[in-house]
Amino acid sequence: MSTQTRYPEATIEADREVPIIRITRDFRGTPAQLMKAHTDPELFVRWVGPDSISSRIVEWDVRNGGSWRYVSSRGDDEFAFRGCFHTVSDDTIVQTFTWEGMPDQVALETLHFEDLGDGTTRLHAQSLCDSFEARDGWLSSGMEVGVNEGYAKLDGLLGEL
């Protein structure tokens, strides 16, 4: 699969020992720009998810202990997601992530923005799922399409910041 990005698609890996998904991708932008794109609700909805959906923010309280919820739509179908921000710092976000279609499956996500020193930032994302079955369900869902199409949109957005 190919997208129009300056960088290769995201690397998506599953850990064999623990139910973790790791995603790594480089972006042309600073850690501060990537943090802003992940925490500013008006920017976030412009890039999150595949091209075939649109998203709206329902709740967005970016602070340690704050919560968030957004709804993505495709035609008449809606998909709601929610979580809590546990840590928000200059280069790291730790949050929970739940798709409301399976509310008992909660993942703990860590996003870290590594400054590579040449105007490039490497995103390290890790999702610790509550079971191997949940993790494998994510991986078999076609999530890579949403990840890569969303990150391609994020590439374009970073050029505006």
Q: Which residues does each PLM region occupy?
A:
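Hydrophobic ligand-binding cavity/cleft-lining segments
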Residues: M1-I53
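Intrinsic-disorder/low-complexity, polar/charged segments enriched in Ser/Thr/Lys/Arg/Asp/Glu/Gln
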Residues: V18-T24, P31, S55, S67, ...
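Beta-strand/loop substructures that line and gate deep hydrophobic ligand-binding cavities in soluble
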Residues: I20, V94, T98-N148
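Short beta-edge strand/loop motif at the mouth of beta-sheet-based domains
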Residues: R22-I23, E42-A80
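Hydrophobic/aromatic beta-strand elements that line small-molecule binding cavities or substrate pockets
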Residues: T24-R25, I57-W60, F81-H86, F97, ...
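A short, structured loop/turn motif at beta-sheet edges
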Residues: P31-A32, R63, H86-D91, F113-R122
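Hydrophobic pocket/interface hotspot
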Residues: L34, F44, W68, F85, ...
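Short, highly charged C-terminal tails/helix-capping segments
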Residues: I57, L158-L161
